[in-house]
């Protein structure tokens, strides 16, 4: 029996050696590009909220506080209304992700991604033309619905289309596009920072990535699993043949037979209540992991760092332009780390990257806290010299690198691959909803936490990183290389979760 810290031998779970074809690559690139809109929004928000014309128009009280010479550096931008601008998107995303479970089950993954793209596009246009707070928040809500739909559908699409052996690498593409969106947004913020209407350009250009991914989705087919679950057997066969290649007809028939078996369970599940099904004892391991992992991802502190990096860097002594450059460097390092993870994820596995990244992030959070403590102190009235400020940037870059190969991509990958088809749309929706809820809570409270906890805020996140690393060591089984429809075996062989699962594939 495998222990909590050991990999499981489930190589017999599937003997289908699906090849990488041009159709697989193109379909996965298009689906992964849904991450662009999420990343762009993460990157654009923090930069826009430091632009003087934006603050003058919508948040003059924040601008007044920032201009006061004796303001505590920890509390410069502590405004619930300002954070509401950023975090309102995630309330809408939470609602949309729950609705998306029904949409993906009834209309497919592809349709849900297209709907998300259109919704995000309209939200971007409203934000770019915003004349008051009401328009600004309304646009953010539409953006939230857009990312709620795409964040639910895209990871599932990738897990269902990618060959099992390379599922990790293809699924990480979603996180890579998120990071590319962040980097692009940082560059745009830097370019528009000095313009009077720069904030309008930054917010309005969110329509560009939305248009790119929406148009791309029009040219790909839905996943075979989704088509079968909706009773479209012939279309599923055609889609699978296109993805795997006509020269692999034997493997296609074998894989199709396995998908048909799984789809029958999904069709039967339509008559069952969502909560009744997913709360069954046999799905307890899936549910716990799918809820805990997105919560832990946000408790690393990475998203609030991405939102408020320009604010943070300005607080420790950088000017507006240098702060945006430092934020760009942070995003670029994260992207590089993500690209590295695509090359090693299916070799070293999920657990190793989770643990290695967790240790690195923990050390960096402690180091940043110590640095802030000895420079600006607990009162926040001290002055941080440029050398120390640069050190903070370096530490946060190392931290971002650790996140980029661990909790960044794997928090999207693991929940999308662990659920059986019967509850996969509902399970992924729940996981994404939890992610949005945690993001909202932390983004809404981060600036207040920084103001109240001072440098202790970084120790707070460090404590959570320690906790989540222990959780991975003890309770997360290895899933690399296992076909998604044979994933039940990892739970049946896990030292703890086996007590909840039955020795069947249902």
UniProtKB/Swiss-Prot annotation:
The chain crosses the membrane at residues 20-40, 81-101, 117-137, 141-161, 168-188, 201-221, 287-307, 325-345, 352-372, 390-410, 430-450, 456-476. Its main location: membrane. It is a multi-pass membrane protein. InterPro entries: MFS_dom, MFS_STP/MST-like_plant, MFS_sugar_transport-like, MFS_trans_sf, STP/PLT_plant, Sugar/inositol_transpt, Sugar_transporter_CS. It is found in: Membrane. Keywords: Membrane, Sugar transport, Symport, Transmembrane, Transmembrane helix, Transport. PROSITE patterns: MFS, SUGAR_TRANSPORT_2. GO terms for cellular component: membrane. It comes from the Eukaryota. Belongs to the major facilitator superfamily. Sugar transporter (TC 2.A.1.1) family. Mediates an active uptake of hexoses, probably by sugar/hydrogen symport. PANTHER family: SOLUTE CARRIER FAMILY 2, FACILITATED GLUCOSE TRANSPORTER (PTHR23500), SUGAR TRANSPORT PROTEIN 5 (PTHR23500:SF44). This is Sugar transport protein 5.
């Amino acid at each position: 029996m495998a222990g909590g810290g050991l990999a499981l031998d489930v190589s017999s779970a599937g003997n289908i050696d699906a090849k990488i074809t041009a159709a697989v690559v193109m379909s996965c690139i298009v689906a992964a590009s849904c991450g662009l809109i999420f990343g762009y929004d993460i990157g654009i928000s923090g930069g826009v909220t430091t632009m003087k014309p934006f603050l003058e128009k919508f948040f003059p009280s924040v601008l007044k506080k920032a201009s006061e010479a004796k303001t505590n550096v920890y509390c410069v931008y502590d405004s619930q209304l300002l954070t509401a601008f950023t975090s309102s998107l995630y309330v809408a995303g939470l609602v949309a992700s729950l609705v998306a479970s029904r949409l993906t089950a009834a209309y497919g993954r592809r349709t849900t991604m297209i709907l998300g793209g259109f919704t995000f596009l309209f939200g971007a246009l409203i934000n770019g033309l915003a004349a008051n707070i009401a328009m600004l928040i309304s646009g953010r809500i539409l953006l939230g619905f857009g990312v709620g739909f795409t964040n639910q559908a895209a990871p599932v699409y990738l897990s269902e289309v990618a060959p099992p052996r390379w599922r990790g690498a293809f699924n990480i593409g979603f996180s890579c596009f998120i990071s590319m969106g962040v980097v692009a947004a940082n560059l745009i913020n830097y370019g528009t920072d000095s313009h009077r209407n720069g904030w309008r350009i930054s917010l309005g250009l969110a329509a560009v990535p939305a248009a790119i991914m929406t148009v791309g989705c029009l040219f790909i087919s839905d996943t075979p699993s989704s088509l079968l679950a909706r009773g479209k057997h012939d279309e599923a066969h055609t889609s699978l043949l296109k993805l795997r290649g006509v020269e692999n007809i034997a493997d296609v028939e074998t894989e199709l037979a396995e998908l048909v078996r799984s789809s029958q369970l999904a069709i039967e599940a339509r008559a069952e209540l969502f909560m009744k099904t997913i709360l069954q004892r046999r799905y307890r391991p899936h549910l716990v992991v799918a809820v805990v992992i997105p919560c832990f991802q946000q408790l690393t502190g990475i998203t609030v760092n991405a939102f408020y990096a320009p604010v943070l860097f300005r607080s420790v002594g950088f000017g507006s332009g240098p702060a945006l450059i430092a934020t760009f460097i942070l995003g670029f390092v994260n992207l590089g780390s993500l690209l590295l993870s695509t090359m090693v994820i299916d070799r070293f596995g999920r657990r190793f990257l989770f643990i290695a990244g967790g240790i690195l992030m923990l050390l960096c959070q402690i180091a940043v806290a110590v640095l802030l403590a000895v420079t600006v102190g607990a009162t926040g009235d001290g002055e941080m010299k440029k050398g120390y400020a640069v050190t903070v940037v370096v530490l946060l870059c190392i931290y971002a690198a650790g996140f980029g190969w661990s909790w960044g991509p794997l928090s999207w990958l693991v929940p999308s691959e662990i659920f059986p088809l019967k509850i996969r749309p509902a399970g992924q929706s729940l996981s994404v909803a939890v992610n949005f809820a945690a993001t909202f809570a932390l983004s809404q409270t981060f600036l207040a936490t920084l103001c109240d906890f001072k440098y202790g805020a970084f120790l707070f996140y460090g404590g959570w990183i320690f906790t989540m690393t222990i959780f991975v060591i003890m309770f997360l089984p290895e899933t690399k290389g296992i076909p998604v429809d044979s994933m039940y075996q990892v739970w049946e062989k896990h030292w703890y979760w086996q007590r909840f699962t039955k020795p069947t594939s249902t």
